[in-house]
Amino acid sequence: MTLKLGILGIDHGHIFGMLSHMQQQGCTCDMYWTDGLAVTEEKFNQVFPQVQKMQDRSRILEDPAIHMILISAIPADRAALAIEAMEAGKDVMVDKPGCTTLDQLAAIKATQKRTGRIWSVNFSERFEVRAVTKAAEIGA
């Protein structure tokens, strides 16, 4: 089974790594939504021309073929989008920070428990930054 992804928010550059690494694992993605015009949007459209922008995020959330949502919206919006995605039956991988308040975290936990969906936070710096990976190789 191929895992199909949708994207909500491309406001932070981590979306490039999030999506490309998922594609390297065999996932597909052909739709994204972002609020307004993200600073990353021009480059995103160049790097991922097959991923088309939707004007309404419900097209992504209501698509039964989409299994998982990647979220790299502005930090204050990530929790609400993750909750909306889990309530729509999707698993979620959100850019860090996954939320910005303890109230948001409590709401995410409650939604995860109620829906049984996966909520995960992408953390890649220790695996991708050359200086860090080199330090690990030499035992630092």
Which positions does each model-derived feature cover?
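Beta-loop-alpha module in the N-terminal Rossmann-like domain of NAD(P)-dependent dehydrogenases
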Residues: 48-111
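A contiguous active-site-proximal alpha/beta segment in oxidoreductase catalytic domains
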Residues: 99-140
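N-terminal Rossmann-like dinucleotide-binding module
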Residues: 1-48
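Short amphipathic alpha-helical segments
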Residues: 18-20, 45, 81-84, 106, ...
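Conserved beta-strand segments of alpha/beta enzyme cores
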Residues: 4, 28, 52-53, 59, ...
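Short catalytic-loop micro-motif centered on adjacent basic/acidic residues
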Residues: 6-7, 92-95, 119-122
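Local beta-strand N-terminus motif with an aromatic residue
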Residues: 29, 66-69, 140
